Amino acid sequence: MTKKYGAKAVSKAKLQRWPNPNTDRDYNIDIEFPEFTCLCPRSGYPDFAVIKINYVPDRYIVELKSLKLYLNSFRDRSISHESVTNLLFDDITKLLKPRRLEVTGDFNPRGNVKTVIRVSTEE
C-alpha cells in the first residue's frame, strides 16, 4: 500500500528555522499544538497532550510547518511524558539557540492522573 502524502511528509519531518526579522528587540512567540500524541512506553496506549512552546528568539525563528510535521512524527513513538517534553526542549534549543525558551507538555489524564511537564531556560 502506498503512503498517503501526509504520512510521507511526517516521515521526512525535520525542524527548520528562518532568520528572525527583528533581532534588535526581545519579543515572545507563543505556539500551541493541541493535538499532540505519542505512545506510552509501558502500555502502548496513546497519550494525548497540548504542547506549548514559548520563546524569545535570537537570530532564528522556527518554521511552523516543519514544527507541525516534527510534532506529528511522535504519534507512533513510545516515549514518556518527561522524555518527550525534554527532547522537544533540547531540539528547539539546538536549532534556534533562543534567548529564552519554555516547553510545556500538558498531558490528558490517564487513570485519573494528570501530568504537566515544564522545561525552561529560567532557573
Language-model segments: residues:
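N-terminal intrinsically disordered, cationic/polar leader segments
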Residues: 1-123
